[in-house]
C-alpha cells in the first residue's frame, strides 16, 4: 500500500517493513511513492540489514543532514566495538561504551584521568563515568543503548537523539496553490473595470479586462515551495445610470472565466506536482460617484459575485479532481482632489480603502492513496488601503494619464489545509506591500484603454507580479 493510513507523524528509527534475519545483498526499491498525510517516505537499509520506511533528507539533498543510506554510516562515522556505530567519536573496545571520549578496556580504567570505582559501578556491560550512568544517563547493556538516549539495537542505526528530517509530498503545495488561487481569482477593485476620468451623465460603460498574475512563496514551514500563474477574463456592462441630488449612481452586471496553474516542489524531494483551477464567475456591481462627469470628490463602489471552480492535482503518484464554489462581496470607498497648479499638468490624489468578504466551500477530497484533504474554515476577509496619484492634463481630462498606486494589502485568505487531519499552512503573509504603475487614455471619443503593471511582496519569500489590460466603451 502507498498510504500509511495515518497523519504521517515524525519517525525516529523509521517503520520496519522488511526483516532480513541475516545478511543479504538484495536492494529494495518502492514501486511508487509512499505518502502518509502530508509526508513522503522512502526505503532505507539500516546496519542490521533490515529495511525501514523513513521520511528524511539524504546527503545528495543536504550534506549537513544525517543519513543511513544502506552502508550503515551513523552520524559520527565512528565504530562502537560491537560493530555498532557510535556518535560520540569514541571507541568501545570491549563492547562497552564510555561517552566521555575514554575507552573502558575491561579493567575498568576511565582514561580521562579518572579511576572507575570511585563509588561508581562498572558492571561489565556497563555503568561508568564517575558515578554517572554511561552515555548521558543511558545504559549500555551489550546490545546496546548508546548516544544520548537513543537505542542502538545491536547494529541498528543510532539517530543521535535527533528526529530524522521530514520530507513533504509535493502534492501538498499544489493543493495549497489551488486553494489560494480559487479564493483570489475574481477579486477586483473599481479601477480594474472603471478607471474612466470623464463620463456624460447618461453614458453606460461596457468593459472587458484581461489580467495575468504570477506569484511564488514557500509554505509548510519552508518544506514546500510553489508558484502559480493566473489568467482572468472578465466582461461587464452598465445597465443603469441614474443622476441623484448629490452625485450619480451606476449599476451593471459581469461574468468571467479564469485559469490558474501551479507548480510545486518539496524540499529534499526529487518529485514535483502540478495544480490547475478552472473558474467561472457571475456578479453585479454598483458605484456612486459624487461628481457626475469627472472622477472627483468621493465615491462608493460595491460588487457581489458567485464563482465555481474545477480543480486538479497531478503528479507521478495520482491524478486528482475535486470541485469548489463560493461567493465574494466588496465595499470600496475613495476621495479624489486636484493639487492646484498653474502648469498644464498637475496631480490628482485619491486615497482608497476596500474590504472584501470571501466564502469558498471546497469539497473534502480523499485521493487515490487514501490521503484526506480537508479545509479548516470557509470564509475570510481581505483589506486594502492605498493612495492613487494620477498626472493629468487640466484642460483635457480625457488625455492620457499616467498614474502610480501604493497599497497595503491585509489578509491572506484561508491559508491552511489539513492532510489526514494534520494542518499545513500556505504561509502567505498576512501583510503585503503592492506597487502599481499604469496609464489610461482614449483610443477615440468613446473607447478608453488602460494598461497596468504591478508588484507585490511579503514575508516567506512571497512575491507576486501582474499585468492588466482594460478596454472601456461608453455608449
Task: Please give the residue ranges for each predicted region.
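Outer-membrane translocation/initiation segment of Type V secreted surface proteins
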Residues: 3-246
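Short glycine/proline-enriched turns and hinge-like loops at secondary-structure junctions
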Residues: 9-10, 225, 344-345, 398, ...
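Outer membrane beta-barrel transmembrane domains
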Residues: 243, 280-283, 372-475
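Outer-membrane beta-barrel strand-turn architecture
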Residues: 200, 241-245, 290-294, 337-343, ...
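Transmembrane beta-strands of outer-membrane beta-barrel proteins
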Residues: 206-208, 249-253, 282, 296-304, ...
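Flexible, surface-exposed loop regions and adjacent strand-edge segments
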Residues: 224-228, 268-274, 316-323, 366-373, ...
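Outer membrane beta-barrel translocator domains of Type V secretion systems
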Residues: 156-341, 453-454, 459
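Detector for outer-membrane/organellar transmembrane beta-barrel domains
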Residues: 322-338, 342-416
Amino acid at each position: 500500500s502507498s498510504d500509511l493510513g495515518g497523519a504521517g507523524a515524525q519517525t525516529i528509527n523509521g517503520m520496519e517493513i522488511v526483516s532480513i534475519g541475516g545478511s543479504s545483498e538484495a536492494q529494495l526499491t518502492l514501486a511508487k511513492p509512499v505518502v502518509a498525510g502530508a509526508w513522503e517516505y522512502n526505503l532505507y537499509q539500516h546496519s542490521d540489514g533490515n529495511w525501514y520506511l523513513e521520511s528524511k533528507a539524504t546527503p545528495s539533498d543536504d550534506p549537513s543532514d544525517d543519513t543511513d543510506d544502506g552502508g550503515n554510516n551513523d552520524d559520527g562515522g565512528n565504530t562502537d566495538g560491537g560493530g555498532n556505530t557510535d556518535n560520540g567519536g569514541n571507541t568501545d573496545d570491549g563492547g562497552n561504551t564510555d561517552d566521555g571520549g575514554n575507552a573502558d578496556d575491561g579493567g575498568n580504567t576511565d582514561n580521562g584521568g579518572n579511576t572507575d570505582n570511585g563509588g561508581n559501578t562498572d558492571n561489565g556491560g556497563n555503568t561508568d563515568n564517575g558515578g554517572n550512568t554511561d552515555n548521558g544517563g543511558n545504559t549500555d547493556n551489550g546490545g546496546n543503548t548508546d548516544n544520548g538516549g537513543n537505542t542502538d539495537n545491536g547494529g541498528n542505526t543510532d539517530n543521535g537523539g535527533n528526529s530524522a528530517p521530514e520530507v513533504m509530498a509535493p502534492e501538498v503545495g499544489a493543493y495549497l496553490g489551488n486553494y489560494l488561487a480559487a479564493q483570489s481569482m475574481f477579486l477586483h477593485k473599481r479601477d480594474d473595470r472603471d478607471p474612466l476620468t470623464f463620463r456624460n451623465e447618461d453614458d453606460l460603460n461596457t468593459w472587458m479586462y484581461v489580467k495575468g498574475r504570477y506569484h511564488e512563496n514557500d509554505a509548510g514551514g519552508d518544506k514546500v515551495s510553489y508558484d502559480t500563474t493566473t489568467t482572468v477574463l472578465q466582461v461587464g456592462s452598465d445597465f443603469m445610470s441614474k443622476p441623484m441630488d448629490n452625485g450619480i449612481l451606476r449599476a451593471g452586471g459581469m461574468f468571467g472565466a479564469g485559469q490558474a496553474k501551479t507548480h510545486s516542489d518539496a524540499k529534499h524531494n526529487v518529485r514535483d506536482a502540478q495544480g490547475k483551477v478552472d473558474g467561472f464567475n457571475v456578479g453585479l456591481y454598483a458605484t456612486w460617484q459624487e461628481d457626475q462627469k469627472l472622477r472627483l470628490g468621493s465615491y462608493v463602489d460595491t460588487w457581489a459575485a458567485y464563482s465555481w471552480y474545477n480543480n486538479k492535482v497531478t503528479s507521478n503518484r495520482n491524478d486528482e479532481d475535486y470541485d469548489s464554489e463560493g461567493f465574494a462581496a466588496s465595499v470600496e470607498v475613495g476621495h479624489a482632489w486636484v493639487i492646484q497648479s498653474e502648469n498644464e499638468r498637475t496631480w490628482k490624489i485619491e486615497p482608497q480603502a476596500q474590504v472584501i468578504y470571501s466564502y469558498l466551500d471546497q469539497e473534502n477530497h480523499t485521493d487515490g492513496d487514501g490521503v484526506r484533504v480537508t479545509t479548516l474554515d470557509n470564509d475570510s476577509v481581505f483589506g486594502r488601503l492605498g493612495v492613487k496619484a494620477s498626472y493629468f492634463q487640466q484642460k483635457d481630462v480625457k488625455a492620457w494619464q499616467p498614474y502610480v498606486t501604493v497599497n497595503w494589502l491585509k489578509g491572506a485568505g484561508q491559508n491552511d489545509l489539513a492532510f489526514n487531519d494534520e494542518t499545513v499552512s500556505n504561509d502567505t503573509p498576512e501583510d503585503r506591500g503592492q506597487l502599481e504603475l499604469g496609464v489610461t487614455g482614449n483610443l477615440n471619443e468613446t473607447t478608453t484603454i488602460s494598461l497596468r503593471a504591478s508588484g507585490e511582496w511579503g514575508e516567506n519569500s512571497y512575491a507576486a507580479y501582474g499585468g492588466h489590460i482594460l478596454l472601456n466603451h461608453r455608449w
